[in-house]
């Protein structure tokens, strides 16, 4: 066991062990493509490819380093080999468009099987074709703009309560753990209707273990992160199965309504063709949404606070906008769904934060036919990877890309080149919860500036770490808070 533990510390040895058979097979398969013009690049060693360099880059404060080094050497399309798969990385808006606009024509979604075991193979990300349409339609019943209006007040009051109870009254706070607690509290209430803090805490802890395991070496051996994640996923499934059955009984008894939360919506969903969801699909999509809403919302909220701490003039403009909205209200009247449209500058600040610090790195696809692009052939069966970093942080698409400039998103980003700004993905696979995330982020910003007149990072130069993705402050972003009188 000590030797195995050493492997977890030495990923270079471990990846050689894990990828040896797949690497040999893929090496000889690649010989069959010698007659076609493949993109430039390096497949690395037959056994491990360039997996080590890729993983090392993702775990750093600059996850884009792997991509940028090869872009400068090979251009906007290059080949590599990642986790045993020959992969073509497509950069720039043209490459993004190819990958994101050709679902089921040229490409299909493709995630590592080890990750799908933790998220759930019957979730939206694991579906294609008609099955993808059915599951997406079910989720839209809850996550679409029309449905979100029904949950606006509940989300707003939950965020306000969290800030009042866990932020206000403090001179200092560490942002990341508080944001994680807030995001999970909102998700558990709106997804499951869970209000018991002990159950929220149990689910929260399980999810943390699963998230760490999702980005670890996939060894299902006691003591390893992936094994712990598999066990946590099984426990999570048991709890969620119980919640599903309990809610089904409540719906039958008339003590729960069809639209009170996501669980009820999915249990009662039937589309125009009579399709509904099996319990396994409901369970796996809950798991996916917990991952998505938790991990990809933690980053925007945390980095939003980091950015505003460095730009007090933007914080003041956000506060002025929010208090301007409140000035139109009667005494004691809370903000409403329609007020989100008036948060124009606040949303520009959020958009610029998402541009500079994308909540997702990118996603993989698999070529379902030979693809001809820019004079090269991408063979059927190869993986394709698009990334947010190939455009969102590039000077050629965003002038002064390293500077925080919310004004670039004035007029709803009409001056932004298509397929250069993709913080939630795009095409058929755009994140189904992006409107949910937008509402949550703007409500958090609203209640935060109401409570605090300003903030200051205790360490403005705090480093970021991508373990796991996306990169976040290594110490959780300690800040000083200045309460409003």
From Swiss-Prot:
Organism (species): Taxus cuspidata (Japanese yew)
Family: Belongs to the cytochrome P450 family.
Known catalytic reactions: taxa-4(20),11-dien-5alpha-ol + reduced [NADPH--hemoprotein reductase] + O2 = taxa-4(20),11-dien-5alpha,13alpha-diol + oxidized [NADPH--hemoprotein reductase] + H2O + H(+)
Enzyme category, top tier: oxidoreductase
PROSITE patterns in UniProt: CYTOCHROME_P450
UniProt EC number: 1.14.14.106
Name of the protein this chain belongs to: Taxane 13-alpha-hydroxylase
KW Oxidoreductase (keyword) present: yes
Positions with a binding annotation for heme: 431
């Amino acid at each position: 066991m000590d030797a195995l533990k050493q492997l977890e510390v030495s990923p270079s040895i471990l990846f050689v062990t894990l990828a040896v058979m797949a690497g040999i097979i893929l090496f000889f398969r690649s010989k069959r493509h010698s007659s076609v013009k493949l993109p430039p690049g390096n497949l690395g060693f037959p056994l491990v490819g360039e997996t080590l360099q890729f993983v090392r880059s993702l775990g750093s404060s600059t996850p884009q380093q792997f991509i940028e080094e090869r872009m400068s050497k090979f251009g906007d399309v290059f080949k590599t080999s990642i986790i045993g798969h020959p992969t073509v990385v497509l950069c720039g808006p043209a490459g993004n468009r190819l990958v994101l606009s050709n679902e089921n024509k040229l490409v299909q979604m493709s995630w590592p099987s080890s990750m799908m075991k933790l998220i759930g193979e019957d979730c939206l990300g694991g579906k294609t074709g008609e099955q993808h349409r059915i599951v997406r339609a079910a989720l839209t019943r809850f996550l679409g703009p029309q449905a979100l209006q029904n949950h606006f007040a509940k989300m707003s009051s939950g965020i306000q309560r969290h800030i009042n109870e866990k932020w206000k009254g403090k001179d200092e706070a560490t942002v990341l753990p508080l944001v994680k607690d807030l995001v999970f509290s909102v998700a558990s209430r709106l997804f499951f209707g869970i209000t018991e803090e002990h159950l929220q805490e149990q689910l929260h802890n399980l999810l943390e273990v699963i998230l760490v395991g999702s980005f670890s070496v996939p060894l299902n051996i006691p003591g390893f992160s992936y094994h712990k994640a598999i066990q946590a996923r099984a426990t999570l499934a048991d709890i969620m199965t119980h919640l599903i059955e309990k809610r089904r009984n409540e719906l039958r008894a008339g003590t729960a309504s069809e639209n009170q939360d996501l669980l009820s919506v999915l249990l009662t969903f039937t589309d125009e063709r009579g399709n509904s969801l099996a319990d396994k699909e409901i369970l796996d999509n809950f798991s996916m949404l917990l991952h998505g809403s938790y991990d990809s919302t933690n980053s925007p909220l945390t980095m939003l606070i980091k950015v505003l701490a460095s730009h007090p003039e933007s914080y003041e403009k956000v506060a002025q906008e929010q208090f301007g909205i409140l000035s139109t209200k009667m005494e004691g009247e809370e903000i409403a769904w329609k007020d989100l449209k008036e948060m124009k500058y606040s949303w520009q600040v959020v958009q610029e934060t998402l541009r500079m610090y994308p909540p997702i790195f990118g996603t993989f696809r698999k070529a379902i036919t030979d693809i001809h692009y820019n004079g090269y052939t991408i063979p059927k069966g190869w993986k394709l990877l698009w990334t947010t970093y190939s455009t969102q942080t590039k000077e050629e698409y965003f002038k002064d890309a390293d500077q925080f400039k919310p004004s670039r998103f004035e007029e709803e980003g009409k001056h932004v080149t298509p397929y250069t700004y993709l913080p939630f993905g795009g095409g058929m696979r755009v994140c189904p919860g992006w409107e949910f995330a937008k509402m949550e982020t703007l409500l958090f910003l609203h209640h935060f500036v109401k409570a605090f007149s300003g903030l200051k990072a205790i360490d403005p130069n705090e480093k970021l770490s991508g373990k796991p993705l996306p990169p976040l402050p290594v110490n959780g972003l300690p800040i000083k808070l200045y309460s409003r009188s």
